[in-house]
Amino acid sequence: MARTKQTARKSTGGKAPRKQLATKAARKSAPATGGVKKPHRFRPGTVALREIRRYQKSTELLIRKLPFQRLVREIAQDFKTDLRFQSSAVAALQEAAEAYLVGLFEDTNLCAIHAKRVTIMPKDIQLARRIRGERA
């Protein structure tokens, strides 16, 4: 590994760490009471980044099939009663809906980044849809 030049830094003037003799020794020798292990927690954002990578790699549908099918049938009821759907038609609708949502969230994220934020907000979705020409 290449050696890098170290630059001098100003000391912050913090206190030197004190030695803890009695308390640490007592803590180490004492048996663990209860024995309940604290559940492991990742730092905020770690799991979110892992999920982003996982879902960007995958191609499977993210909305469950039956709830989506019920939604399609419920919306179709407003136009005509007793409509029947081929399973491939519902699958095509679901593919299109998920592709639309993914694209909308990508544009929404760009709007949030443009506003120097990392959190998306409803106003970002509204701006993305307005720029796309979907809503005046």
From Swiss-Prot:
Keyword line: Acetylation, Chromosome, DNA-binding, Methylation, Nucleosome core, Nucleus, Phosphoprotein
CDD domains linked to this entry: HFD_H3 (cd22911)
Residue positions where Phosphothreonine is found in the record: 12
Alphabetical list of InterPro entries matching this protein: Histone-fold (IPR009072), Histone_H2A/H2B/H3 (IPR007125), Histone_H3/CENP-A (IPR000164)
One Pfam family in the UniProt entry: Histone
Matching SMART domains: H3
Modified residues (Phosphoserine): 11, 29
N6-acetyllysine carried by residues: 10, 15, 19, 24
Region: Disordered, residue numbers: 1-43
Subcellular location: Nucleus; Chromosome
Xref: Gene3D superfamilies: Histone, subunit A (1.10.20.10)
GO molecular function terms listed in the Swiss-Prot or TrEMBL record: DNA binding; protein heterodimerization activity; structural constituent of chromatin
Primary location class: nucleus
PTM: Acetylation is generally linked to gene activation. Can be acetylated to form H3K9ac, H3K14ac, H3K18ac and H3K23ac. H3K9ac could compete with H3K9me and prevent gene silencing. H3K9ac is restricted to euchromatin. Methylated to form mainly H3K4me, H3K9me, H3K18me, H3K23me, H3K27me and H3K36me. H3K4me1/2/3, H3K9me3, H3K27me3 and H3K36me1/2/3 are typical marks for euchromatin, whereas heterochromatic chromocenters are enriched in H3K9me1/2 and H3K27me1/2. H2BK143ub1 is probably prerequisite for H3K4me.
GO CC annotation: nucleosome; nucleus
Positions of modified residues (N6-methylated lysine): 5, 10, 19, 24, 28, 37
Entries under PROSITE patterns matching the protein: HISTONE_H3_1 (PS00322), HISTONE_H3_2 (PS00959)
Quaternary structure note: The nucleosome is a histone octamer containing two molecules each of H2A, H2B, H3 and H4 assembled in one H3-H4 heterotetramer and two H2A-H2B heterodimers. The octamer wraps approximately 147 bp of DNA.
Similarity comment: Belongs to the histone H3 family.
Record-given protein name: Histone H3.2
Source organism of this protein record: Encephalartos altensteinii
